[in-house]
Structures are given as structure tokens and as C-alpha cells.
From Swiss-Prot:
This is Flavodoxin/ferredoxin--NADP reductase. The gene is fpr. Its cofactor is FAD. Its main location: cytoplasm. GO terms for biological process: cellular response to oxidative stress; heme catabolic process; iron-sulfur cluster assembly; response to superoxide; response to xenobiotic stimulus. Transports electrons between flavodoxin or ferredoxin and NADPH. Reduces flavodoxin 1, flavodoxin 2 and ferredoxin, ferredoxin being the kinetically and thermodynamically preferred partner. Required for the activation of several enzymes such as pyruvate formate-lyase, anaerobic ribonucleotide reductase and cobalamin-dependent methionine synthase.
């Protein structure tokens, strides 16, 4: 049984009509950057719960979550309606293996995300530990519209902080936007446009690819890299070149 603790909302940041971030104070156990927990609310006499990744660094007591409101969802519209001072239930112990401990050494670490799945990477990069073993870091955030790139300012801050080691790139699929590539991640890899824009190759000799978000993006990218680059899924018992987390 999960141990639930009561958290208090300290901030609600509405990015768009559908995207928002919750900041919560709660007595949770220490977690590893990249992990997730569960948020819950009592609705009609039962606890409704969903898993959400931590966006904040583990050394930051402001627990931050990046969410999308599902119009007919049972929980997300209620979470979106919370105000500072409101209570929310949080599972105290985090879970998940989408962490740097599970990533083998390589020259270039590619971190590819769609939508709200940018969260785990922001936690990892804000903490900044265990990254010395990579020569290059690449963070790619794909969304439908430029307005959905909620954490671009933080991505730009991190890019400066890493002084040339971190390269960031945004992608939009439903419009063209300055500074963003247009299309979807698998197609941009297939065409070579993503690599030429970043200026680094994505291959099994130099790279490890982390994939987080839309299951279709994850599957399509894995299939493409397997077929065209001979890259394989990374398992503890059989080291490979791709680590993934589906976001629903």
C-alpha cells in the first residue's frame, strides 16, 4: 500500500487553457531526479489518483508538477481548479526507473520529450549531478504549438548554465514558429534535420537516447532508430542505446 501524505498547494501557474503547473509543499521521502509520484483528491467519496513526474530538482522543497487538463478527466480539471492553500494528497515515496543511474556512459545524451513529459529532464538538469560522464547533452521538447512550450525560459536558463555542454531545441507540429523545428520528432530524425540543426550525430557509437511522452512518438522513434541506426532498447541484462517512459 502506498503511503499518502497531505500536501498544500503553494502556487498554480496557468500556462494555457489546458496546461498548468502545480507547486506543492508535502513531507515526501527523498526522490531521484526523473522519478514520479501520485497526486490524489477525494472525489465523491473515493480517492482519485494519477501519476505525475517531479519537475523540480530533488534538492528543492517546492514540489513541482506539469499537467495537462483532460476535458472529461476525473482528476485533472479538479487539480487545475486548486488554489494556493488548498490540500492535495501525495504518495510520499517516488517510483520509476527513468533516471540517470539506468543510463550507460556515452558521448552524447539525447533527451527527447513531448508535451508535459519534459518534466523528468528538467528535474535531472536542474539537479545537475552525474552529468560529467557525458560530453554533450541535448534536450528536445516537442509540442503542438509554440504557446505549449511552457518551460522554454527554464530550458534557456539551463542552456546558459551548462556553458555549451547542453543544446536545446524546440519542435512544433501544428504551426511554424521562430527558433522551433516544424514537424514530429521521428520525421525530423529520419530526415536528418534534427541532427543537422543540433550539430551532433545520433548513432549507437556515440549516443544514448532517452524518450519520454506520447507513446506513439516513443514507439515510432524506437522503431526508426532500430531499423536505420541499429540502436536497441537498453535493459539491465542487455545494455542498449534507448531508454523510454510512456506518459499514458
Amino acid at each position: 500500500m502506498a503511503d499518502w501524505v497531505t500536501g498544500k498547494v503553494t502556487k498554480v501557474q496557468n500556462w494555457t487553457d489546458a496546461l498548468f503547473s502545480l507547486t506543492v509543499h508535502a513531507p515526501v521521502l527523498p526522490f531521484t531526479a526523473g522519478q514520479f509520484t501520485k497526486l490524489g483528491l477525494e472525489i465523491d467519496g473515493e480517492r482519485v489518483q494519477r501519476a505525475y513526474s517531479y519537475v523540480n530538482s530533488p534538492d528543492n522543497p517546492d514540489l513541482e508538477f506539469y499537467l495537462v487538463t483532460v476535458p472529461d478527466g476525473k482528476l485533472s480539471p479538479r487539480l487545475a481548479a486548486l488554489k494556493p492553500g488548498d490540500e492535495v494528497q501525495v504518495v510520499s515515496e517516488a517510483a520509476g526507473f527513468f533516471v540517470l543511474d539506468e543510463v550507460p556512459h556515452c558521448e552524447t545524451l539525447w533527451m527527447l520529450a513531448t508535451g508535459t513529459a519534459i518534466g523528468p529532464y528538467l528535474s535531472i538538469l536542474q539537479l545537475g549531478k552525474d552529468l560529467d560522464r557525458f560530453k554533450n547533452l541535448v534536450l528536445v521538447h516537442a509540442a503542438r504549438y509554440a504557446a505549449d512550450l511552457s518551460y522554454l525560459p527554464l530550458m534557456q536558463e539551463l542552456e546558459k548554465r551548462y556553458e555549451g555542454k547542453l543544446r536545446i531545441q524546440t519542435v512544433v507540429s501544428r504551426e511554424t514558429a521562430a527558433g522551433s523545428l516544424t514537424g514530429r520528432i521521428p520525421a525530423l530524425i529520419e530526415s536528418g534535420e534534427l541532427e543537422s540543426t543540433i550539430g551532433l550525430p545520433m548513432n549507437k557509437e556515440t549516443s544514448h537516447v532517452m524518450l519520454c511522452g506520447n507513446p506513439q512518438m516513443v514507439r515510432d522513434t524506437q522503431q526508426l532508430l532500430k531499423e536505420t541506426r541499429q540502436m536497441t532498447k537498453h535493459l539491465r541484462r542487455r545494455p542498449g542505446h534507448m531508454t523510454a517512459e510512456h506518459y499514458w
